A protein has these predicted regions:
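Phosphodiester-processing cores and adjacent nucleic acid-binding clamps
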Residues: 1-194
């Protein structure tokens, strides 16, 4: 299977998800996944997820949820994904700084071995004024991460698809990658948190 689910929260994010790493990996194996990712605002799920993936011969991808600084009033919701041992070390250094909002200067120092995905999940991303305003910020993050930079987008309806046309054009003109990035918080509908 060529699609990789990256934005899956686990039950280690109390009140955010019901997904247990072992069950998630087992189900992914049944569906033919070869690579699988998790995200969170802590690292607690990493060991059990790594063990479950190793047992099922699935490549594990680890992401960390951050709030990314913006020159606008609304910061960006984003994720740093570990690509290498150096990336893991750099992520630990970023976490050690205990910043609520991560800025460009900190990322300049510790971006090696990491990928950045900005989640384009706010209606503002579909408005021309906002896209023009954030263009400078986005250019700086893209220059820093280069091919390891992307936008994550979730389209849940035909209306979402129509609304996102302007955003797609914005990304196409600037050659920004867009990834399917739906949030997964449960494996079965009956497990959904209210």
């Amino acid at each position: 299977m060529s699609y990789t689910t990256l934005c899956t929260f686990t039950a280690y994010e109390i009140g955010e998800s019901t997904v247990l790493p072992f069950s998630y990996v087992k189900r992914a194996k049944e569906l033919g996944y070869e690579t699988l990712g998790i995200v969170g605002s802590n690292l607690h799920a990493y060991p059990s997820f790594a063990d479950a993936c190793a047992k099922e011969n699935i490549k594990a991808v680890f992401g960390y949820k951050i709030t990314l600084a913006s020159s606008e009033t609304i910061p960006y919701r984003a994720y740093l994904f570990i690509k290498s041992e150096k990336g893991y070390q750099n992520l630990l250094k970023i976490i050690k700084e205990q910043k609520k909002v991560i800025g460009l200067n900190l990322l300049k120092e510790f971006h090696e071995g990491l990928s950045l995905i900005i989640q384009a999940d706010h209606d503002l991303f579909y408005q021309d004024y906002f896209l023009t305003t954030i263009s400078k910020d986005i250019t700086q993050y893209q220059k820093l991460f280069q091919e390891d930079f992307a936008f994550g987008i979730t389209l849940l309806s035909k209306e979402d698809q129509e609304d996102s046309a302007q955003f797609y054009q914005f990304c196409k003109e600037r050659q920004y990658r867009i990834l399917a990035f739906p949030e997964v918080r449960y494996l079965h509908k009956g497990d959904a948190l209210d």
